[in-house]
Amino acid sequence: GIFPYNVPEGQHDPAYLQALQQQALHYINLQQVPDLQLHRARELEVIAKNPTAYHPGYNYAGHYYPGNYYSGYYHPGHYYTALHHNAALHQHSLNEQKVINEQKALIAGQ
C-alpha cells in the first residue's frame, strides 16, 4: 500500500522512508497535477530565474530537510513528519497500555 501507517520493523532508516515518501508523493501528485512534467518544467524555470532562493535540502542520519524544490503541491516534509507523528502516537499508546497492564498486575498481586 501507499500509506503504511505502521512502518515495518527495522525499516526506520531515512533512505527507506524517503523512497516510500517519494512513491506516495508521486501518487498524490498524479491525482492533483494533470501534467506533472509541465508542472516540473515551470518549477525549474522559477528556480533558474532565482537560483539563490533554491535549497536542495539534505538527508543524513537523524536529520531530514526536504528543501524548497518539490514536484506538485505536497511538500515532502508533510508526509515525512506525518509518518513520524504516527509512529510517536503509536509508541505513546503502547506505553500507556504497558502502564495500565502493570497497574492491573499490581492490583491483582495485592
UniProtKB/Swiss-Prot annotation:
Keywords, alphabetical: Cuticle
Molecular function as annotated in GO: structural constituent of cuticle
Superkingdom of origin: Eukaryota
Protein's UniProt name: Cuticle protein 13
Organism of this sequence: Limulus polyphemus (Atlantic horseshoe crab)
